[in-house]
């Protein structure tokens, strides 16, 4: 009997791939994302798909904004994926490919694919939606909802601010994919609310950094000795 991996196993594997300390402001998000990805990975009904991959990448990029040192972000992302036995390069590539496949495809095509019993063509997004529709059991996740929302917002930017249009899109797709609309809306409302909090936090951090910079400049200026006039020599005095 195969032993089911535990959260502790996932965390241990994460720290094997990334042992540096993570800034406290971001540590909680990284831990929560790791646990969420782990619980899905060990769920018998869960199946990885490109929309889910886009949700991972989008969520990570959104909530890790402002992290310093920024050059450590790829390593942290890699460790997250390795922690749940996923290939970080594949996750990134799948996210990129499904986002690209959504370009220039109207919502009507999405709806048709989500209601179809058979894949048609080679469009990754449409085939993913068809595959989900055909699946006997589809394990919904918050990360899938974020991926779907990202695609919708990229297709129609009004989705971000137009509640009625966003609700209409989500209602149609949730019905066809047999998703709980209440869960989808609740998860996305929380996601959007948290994004606003991140923006506010970044503004506070920027203001604090600017205030600290000005303080240091002021201190440096106040401690710089003034240039004194050279004293007049005896010879110069006698000449005058």
Curated annotation (Swiss-Prot):
Pfam families: ThylakoidFormat. It comes from the Bacteria. GO terms for cellular component: plasma membrane-derived thylakoid photosystem II. Residues 186-222 form a coiled coil. InterPro entries: Thf1. Keywords: Coiled coil. GO terms for biological process: photosystem II assembly. May be involved in photosynthetic membrane biogenesis. PANTHER family: PROTEIN THYLAKOID FORMATION 1, CHLOROPLASTIC. This is Protein Thf1. It comes from Synechocystis sp. (strain ATCC 27184 / PCC 6803 / Kazusa). The lineage of its organism: Bacteria, Bacillati, Cyanobacteriota, Cyanophyceae, Synechococcales. The gene is thf1.
């Amino acid at each position: 009997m195969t032993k089911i991996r535990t959260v502790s196993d996932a965390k241990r594997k994460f720290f094997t791939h990334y042992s540096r300390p993570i800034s406290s402001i971001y540590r909680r998000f990284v831990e929560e994302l790791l646990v969420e990805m782990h619980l899905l990975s060990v769920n018998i009904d869960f199946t990885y798909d490109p929309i889910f991959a886009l949700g991972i990448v989008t969520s990570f990029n959104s909530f890790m904004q402002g992290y310093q040192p920024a050059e450590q972000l790829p390593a942290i992302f890699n460790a997250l994926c390795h922690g749940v036995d996923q290939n970080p390069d594949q996750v990134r590539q799948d996210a990129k490919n499904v986002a690209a496949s959504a370009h220039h495809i109207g919502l009507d095509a999405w709806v048709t694919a989500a209601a179809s019993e058979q894949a048609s063509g080679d469009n990754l997004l449409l085939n993913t939606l068809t595959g989900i529709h055909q699946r006997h059991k589809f394990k919904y996740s918050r990360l899938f909802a974020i991926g779907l929302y990202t695609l919708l917002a990229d297709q129609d930017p009004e989705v971000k601010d137009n509640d009625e249009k966003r609700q209409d899109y989500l209602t149609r797709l949730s019905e066809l994919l047999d998703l709980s609309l209440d869960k989808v809306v609740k998860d996305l409302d929380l996601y959007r609310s948290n994004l606003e909090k991140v923006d506010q936090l970044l503004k506070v951090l920027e203001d604090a950094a600017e205030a600290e910079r000005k303080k240091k400049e002021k201190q440096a200026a106040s401690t710089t000795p003034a240039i004194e006039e050279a004293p007049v020599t005896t010879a110069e005095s006698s000449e005058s």
